Swiss-Prot record:
Locations listed in the record: Cytoplasm
Function description: Activates KDO (a required 8-carbon sugar) for incorporation into bacterial lipopolysaccharide in Gram-negative bacteria.
Gene Ontology cellular-component terms listed: cytosol
Organism: Methylorubrum populi (strain ATCC BAA-705 / NCIMB 13946 / BJ001)
Substrates-to-products reaction catalysed: 3-deoxy-alpha-D-manno-oct-2-ulosonate + CTP = CMP-3-deoxy-beta-D-manno-octulosonate + diphosphate
PANTHER family the record matches: 3-DEOXY-MANNO-OCTULOSONATE CYTIDYLYLTRANSFERASE, 3-DEOXY-MANNO-OCTULOSONATE CYTIDYLYLTRANSFERASE, MITOCHONDRIAL
Protein name: 3-deoxy-manno-octulosonate cytidylyltransferase
Recorded name of the encoding gene: kdsB
Length: 247
């Protein structure tokens, strides 16, 4: 497996938090915090894929690389595929890691951990999850659960993803973290697939891969990154990063 390429899709079209990637956190745009943490993961080059000049300029001002993509992609995965062909047309990177642009507090170590399952040639896509500890999250449809069985130390093979409380019975529930490491061929196959029945019902893009028979494995991690979707999330991220700077 070659060094992975980390791509961070970012655009301004958030409905609950307008101009989200450029939101100020500790004097810097949120997208810069995400980019910096991806660089600190130390697993490969990092590129931001965007359709917005201001986002590209923010990254380039820090010495980073950004590429411009089309504004009308149906999903982040399609933006990822376009960016991959722009950045690496010769196919030097056979793994691409998709880090969401709204995770300013993410631990670089879990970005690095995301590629671990791809050492197994049977795995098409790798991702992350964490044990749910807060009871209210177990029934929260905004907390996506991964259903799977253990295939190694701190690793699950995904059988399903759902917004419902699942699986039934005693044992932990796992919160899916929306960070993906794709084999390049798997990403190309994925974006060419039609939308799946379960994907439409649950509104979860990753179900398309499972419906097509692709294998997704997840590493179980301790740290659950804060996804910034609302003004309240943004204030929490500002507080968390301010505390980290003091320490």
């Amino acid at each position: 497996m070659s060094d992975p390429l980390i791509l961070i899709p970012a655009r301004l079209a958030a409905t609950r938090l307008p101009s989200k990637p450029l939101a100020d956190i500790a004097g810097e745009p949120m997208i810069v915090h995400v980019w910096r943490r991806a660089v600190e993961a130390g697993i490969g080059p990092v590129v931001v894929a965007t359709d917005t000049d201001a986002i590209a300029a923010a990254i380039e001002a820090q010495g980073g690389l950004a590429v411009m993509t089309q504004p009308d992609h149906p999903s982040g995965s399609d933006r990822l595929a376009e960016a991959l062909e722009i950045v690496d047309p010769d196919g030097n990177h056979d793994v691409v890691v998709n880090v969401q642009g709204d995770l300013p507090t993410i631990d670089p170590a879990i970005i690095a951990a995301s590629v671990t399952p791809l050492a197994d040639p049977q795995v098409d896509i790798a991702t992350l999850c964490a044990v749910i500890h807060r009871p209210e999250e177990m029934d929260d449809p905004n907390v996506v659960k991964i259903i799977g069985h253990t295939v190694g130390p701190n690793r699950l093979r995904a059988l399903a993803f759902t917004r419902a409380r699942a699986p039934w019975g005693e044992g932990p529930l796992f919160h899916h973290i929306g960070l993906y490491a794709y084999r390049r061929k798997a990403l190309a196959r994925f974006v060419a697939l039609p939308q799946g029945e379960l994907e439409r019902r649950e509104k979860l893009e990753q179900l398309r891969a499972l419906e097509a028979g692709m294998r997704i494995d997840a590493m179980i991690v301790e740290d659950l990154p804060l996804g910034v979707d609302t003004p309240a999330d943004l204030e929490r991220a500002r507080t968390l990063l301010a505390i980290r700077r003091l320490n």
